[in-house]
Structures are given as structure tokens and as C-alpha cells.
Amino acid sequence: MACSNWVFTRNFQGALPLLSFDERVQYAVWQHERGTHDHIQGVIQLKKKARFSTVKEIIGGNPHVEKMKGTIEEASAYVQKEETRVAGPWSYGDLLKRGSHRRKTMERYLEDPEEMQLKDPDTALRCNAKRLKEDFMKEKTKLQLRPWQKELHDLILTEPDDRTIIWVYGPDGGEGKSMFAKELIKYGWFYTAGGKTQDILYMYAQDPERNIAFDVPRCSSEMMNYQAMEMMKNRCFASTKYRSVDLCCNKNVHLVVFANVAYDPTKISEDRIVIINC
């Protein structure tokens, strides 16, 4: 099976072999050790996962290689131990710690977004979305709460249950529904304008313990997705888009619908709905 982090031992007699690596290697560290015989012991971290035979070819000299157990930091420290060291240690490249790849990708994007757009447009798109959201989250909005907003604010500070859907109804527009809904994003809420059920569930499944805000445009009022609302509020649903996953969550969340129309009692149980009029 392919892996990116490996440990290796290369036995030798006579002159110390010189190790050299190419662009496939992210990081390597090794030293000359002597126990019962001379050998090189080291770790190697590849930029992409590779199989056993490829790793041996990269190191050269028919080494013994094993998939790394534990963290790359622990393995790196172990192969640099002083007790059996004869010479070294030597290193190549930069250690990529767990969780640091995303930061490095973002750094590359910020350094030259146009270059990444040409080479990897999908990654550039995600990096730009992340940058824009971070800028949005930093922006502080001073809201003078209207009476309905104060009522909603107090309600979402209470403990959510597994049934109640809060329906904010304002038929005229301009009441501040969308402004309030977008502000909730800064407090970790999931924001959606609606759409197809599996599209909504796929996006929500990325972090399914978030509170939920449906900010429904007037033009979409006739296509209100009650199915998605109930599935998300019930805390058990299947997201079948791209990567199928069944999700069951113990944590209850608030679900708020901001709409220009009243709810349809033929499509959702009336006892679920708490109405706030704008």
C-alpha cells in the first residue's frame, strides 16, 4: 500500500554512501550509525504517496524500508539519536508537519494567485474562497437590532431542541432578514439560500454540528425545500453527493428560515414552527 512517510536502514561496508534525493522528496534526515555493523538510518517524507519499491529506488542501495509508525517528528528525533551515532545527521528539504499542508498551499496562493490559477484552478478557487470568507469574518457589523431581531436573538440563545424550526416572516422586504442571516455566519452558522436537497446536505455535511440559516430569496419562495430542513433538523440524514455518508448527530441545533412567505402547513407540521413576524 502507498504511503508518504517511511523509515529506512541501509547497511554498508567501507566508505559511507552519499545519499542524494530529487524533487519527489519533501524531507529526509539520516545519520551514520554503528551497532554490530555500519549502517545509515533515516526517515524520508515524500510529496506524494509511493509504494515500497519506489521508496527503495529513491533511497538507493537496496535499503530496508518500513512505513512510519507514530509521527514524523517522533521518527525524525529517533533516527538522530546520539547513542549509536558515528557521523551526521544530515537532512534534505523541509519537514511538513501534520496539518501544515493547507497553510503552505495558502501561502503559495497569496504569493502568486495568477500562477496558481493557471496551474491548479480548482485549488486556486478554494484558496480564494477561504481568503474572502476570512475577510468577511473579520468585518465587524454594528447592528441596531429591530424588535423582531431582538426577539430572534433571544430565542437562538436558548438551548435548541430536535424539532423546532424558527420561521422569520417578512413579506415586504427590506426588514433586515438577509443582513441578520449573513451576520450569523460570523458565529459559525451554516448559511444557505436553498437549492436541491443533496447540494444542501453535501455542504452541511462538511461540519454537521452547525446551527442553520436558510435565507430564501423571494424568487425561490415557491420552491421552499422543506425536505432538507426536516432532515437537517432531525439530526440524521444521508449525504449522497460525491462521497456518500450517513450522518447521525447527538447535538441539537437551531434552524432559522428567513422568508418573504409564510410556511406551507401542507408540507410541514405546524407544531414544528415558531413564527417571528418582521
Swiss-Prot record:
<dbReference type="GO" id="GO:0003723">
    <property type="term" value="F:RNA binding"/>
</dbReference>
<feature type="short sequence motif" description="RCR-2">
    <location>
        <begin position="39"/>
        <end position="41"/>
    </location>
</feature>
<keyword id="KW-0547">Nucleotide-binding</keyword>
<keyword id="KW-0540">Nuclease</keyword>
<dbReference type="GO" id="GO:0016779">
    <property type="term" value="F:nucleotidyltransferase activity"/>
</dbReference>
<feature type="binding site">
    <location>
        <position position="33"/>
    </location>
    <ligand>
        <name>a divalent metal cation</name>
    </ligand>
</feature>
<dbReference type="Pfam" id="PF00910">
    <property type="entry name" value="RNA_helicase"/>
</dbReference>
<keyword id="KW-0548">Nucleotidyltransferase</keyword>
<dbReference type="InterPro" id="IPR049912">
    <property type="entry name" value="CRESS_DNA_REP"/>
</dbReference>
<dbReference type="GO" id="GO:0046872">
    <property type="term" value="F:metal ion binding"/>
</dbReference>
<feature type="binding site">
    <location>
        <begin position="176"/>
        <end position="178"/>
    </location>
    <ligand>
        <name>ATP</name>
    </ligand>
</feature>
<feature type="short sequence motif" description="Nuclear localization signal">
    <location>
        <begin position="48"/>
        <end position="69"/>
    </location>
</feature>
<dbReference type="GO" id="GO:0004519">
    <property type="term" value="F:endonuclease activity"/>
</dbReference>
<keyword id="KW-0347">Helicase</keyword>
<keyword id="KW-0238">DNA-binding</keyword>
<feature type="binding site">
    <location>
        <position position="83"/>
    </location>
    <ligand>
        <name>a divalent metal cation</name>
    </ligand>
</feature>
<dbReference type="GO" id="GO:0005524">
    <property type="term" value="F:ATP binding"/>
</dbReference>
<dbReference type="GO" id="GO:0016887">
    <property type="term" value="F:ATP hydrolysis activity"/>
</dbReference>
<keyword id="KW-1048">Host nucleus</keyword>
<comment type="similarity">
    <text>Belongs to the nanoviridea/circoviridae replication-associated protein family.</text>
</comment>
<feature type="short sequence motif" description="RCR-1">
    <location>
        <begin position="8"/>
        <end position="11"/>
    </location>
</feature>
<feature type="short sequence motif" description="Nuclear localization signal">
    <location>
        <begin position="95"/>
        <end position="101"/>
    </location>
</feature>
<keyword id="KW-0479">Metal-binding</keyword>
<protein>
    <recommendedName>
        <fullName>Para-Rep C1</fullName>
        <ecNumber>2.7.7.-</ecNumber>
        <ecNumber>3.1.21.-</ecNumber>
        <ecNumber>3.6.1.-</ecNumber>
    </recommendedName>
</protein>
<comment type="subunit">
    <text>Homooligomer (Potential). Rep binds to repeated DNA motifs (iterons).</text>
</comment>
<dbReference type="GO" id="GO:0003677">
    <property type="term" value="F:DNA binding"/>
</dbReference>
<feature type="active site" description="For DNA cleavage activity">
    <location>
        <position position="78"/>
    </location>
</feature>
<keyword id="KW-0378">Hydrolase</keyword>
<keyword id="KW-0808">Transferase</keyword>
<comment type="function">
    <text>Initiates and terminates the replication only of its own subviral DNA molecule. The closed circular ssDNA genome is first converted to a superhelical dsDNA. Rep binds a specific hairpin at the genome origin of replication. Introduces an endonucleolytic nick within the intergenic region of the genome, thereby initiating the rolling circle replication (RCR). Following cleavage, binds covalently to the 5'-phosphate of DNA as a tyrosyl ester. The cleavage gives rise to a free 3'-OH that serves as a primer for the cellular DNA polymerase.</text>
</comment>
<feature type="domain" description="CRESS-DNA virus Rep endonuclease">
    <location>
        <begin position="1"/>
        <end position="95"/>
    </location>
</feature>
<keyword id="KW-0235">DNA replication</keyword>
<keyword id="KW-0255">Endonuclease</keyword>
<keyword id="KW-0190">Covalent protein-DNA linkage</keyword>
<keyword id="KW-0067">ATP-binding</keyword>
<dbReference type="InterPro" id="IPR000605">
    <property type="entry name" value="Helicase_SF3_ssDNA/RNA_vir"/>
</dbReference>
<feature type="short sequence motif" description="RCR-3">
    <location>
        <begin position="78"/>
        <end position="81"/>
    </location>
</feature>
<dbReference type="GO" id="GO:0003724">
    <property type="term" value="F:RNA helicase activity"/>
</dbReference>
<dbReference type="GO" id="GO:0042025">
    <property type="term" value="C:host cell nucleus"/>
</dbReference>
<dbReference type="GO" id="GO:0006260">
    <property type="term" value="P:DNA replication"/>
</dbReference>
<keyword id="KW-0511">Multifunctional enzyme</keyword>
<dbReference type="Pfam" id="PF02407">
    <property type="entry name" value="Viral_Rep"/>
</dbReference>
